[in-house]
Amino acid sequence: MTASRRFRRYLAMPLAFAAMLGFASAAELNPAAVVYKLPDQIPWGPLNAAGAQSAVVVGDPSKPGFYMVYNKWTKGNHFSRPHFHPNDRYIVVLQGTWWVGSGPKFDPQNGTVPMPAGSFVTHYGKQVHWDGAKDEDTILLIMGEGPATSTLAEEK
């Protein structure tokens, strides 16, 4: 095999591979079969007074029925006050470390347990808890049955 022929063969292989990758990334999904949002398309709401943002993924948490919500706690020792919900909630920690406390005594420094990314937590309905982030942003996926209200423990 001549040098020019080898050169063309070596040049053709990466070009063919690049073309295959280009075709693979150009695929389109049928919206009747699959609906998706990429991370930069998630509709995050405004930052609330406790230092958290939410984005509804599925359903409507204010109405009866199943819902899924992303919740992002910003770093800087931001915590909710002790509260409870009427229904069970199921939470997956997607990013960061989420700090969880239970009971009416609010003590973020000594009364919380760290839940690293990958943790699964159940908040039982009508049970007092509080939670937040300390030194890193934390993203949660919260699932439950609506309506998803929150009542401060002092109001119980």
Segments predicted by a language model, with ranges:
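Short acidic-glycine-tyrosine-enriched beta hairpin
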Residues: S62, P104-K126
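A short, N-terminal "cap"/entry segment at the start of jelly-roll beta-barrel domains
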Residues: S25-Y70, E155-K156
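Double-stranded beta-helix
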Residues: A33-V35, N110, V128-K156
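Bacterial N-terminal signal peptides that target proteins for export
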Residues: T2-P14
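Bacterial N-terminal signal peptides
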Residues: A12-G22
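Glycine- and acidic-residue-biased ligand/ion/polar-headgroup-sensing regions
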Residues: T74-N77, F84-F106
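Conserved short histidine dyad/triad with adjacent acidic residue
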Residues: Y67-H85, Y124-K126
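Short beta-strand His + acidic residue motifs that chelate non-heme Fe in jelly-roll/DSBH
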Residues: S80-P82, V100-G101, H123, V128-K134
